[in-house]
Amino acid sequence: MSIIIGIDHGYYAIKTAHCSFPAGLTSYGEHEPYTRQGLLEFGGCFFVCGSGRQPIQRDKTANDNYYLLTLAAIAKEIQQRGLPPECSVRIAAGLPLTSFGRDKPKFREYLLRSNQPVNFKFEGVEYSITIEEVAVFPQGYAALMTETGLLQDEPSMLLMDLGGWTVDLMRIDNAIPAADTAHSLELGMIRCVDDIREQVRRETGLSLTDAQIENMLAGQPCTVSDTVRDIVNKQGRKYTEHLLSATMEAGFDLHAIPAVLLGGGASVVSRHLSPKDALCKTIFLLDDKVNAVGFERALAAVSRRKSEA
């Protein structure tokens, strides 16, 4: 029996139903690195997964980076579920609606390769994984399968998936995606973090790490001065204002339509909204793994329908 593993291949992070790690990948060639944490051995080479951030790669199939990160994600999820390292897997993945039809066949082929099973070692454990199937679903909309009541309560709503590089927008009418309204803004969390880092450097001369900025944006502990923390919070509010403005300019009236916000950037917006924004209604799905969970439920539902047919 095969298991379903949902994977959200973000620019900023890779998420499964139970795991989340940065979408960074460092190659060490044939030389074993100093650490076992995140260490992937594949094809005679060593890679460390989850280290930092890789350059923006608009075509995720352009090289093997996202395939290698997929193997790491499978290993992490299998370990988290307590499953054997030799098993069959069905991958449930996702793409933005703006590029869904164009990129779906290519992305599916990229993940579903002919050489099966896939043999690799992750963090010292040997895996032999047979990838039986790759199903691709629309990002954001699939996540709503985790909160089905949201689709029943409103005739129209705006879905805002705040990812690493883009914010994907789509209106949903009577629980059906209005595909012709799909719009993508290059205002994801990478842009937000980079702008904050530059502003802090400009005002204080200090160079913050991504992890420091992310912690402060989330309201978590970080040893910095009050001056730096104030700059980060002001920039978080500025980012939120910019995002709301760009969404309105894209033709979505946030004063008239409820919005569901999800993805890694949703927590930032939730902390920096103000009553003066006068939004109609905002619903936050703050678990950054919600897309991966939605992909799994979508594939399970498809499989059920096939078995009942």
What is the predicted function of each stretch?
Residues 1-157, 176-191, 203, 210-309:
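Nucleotide/phosphate-binding catalytic cleft detector across ATP-hydrolyzing
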Residues 162-168:
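Ser/Thr-glycine-rich phosphate-binding loops at phosphate-binding pockets of nucleotides
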Residues 16, 169-171:
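Conserved blade-register residue in beta-propeller folds
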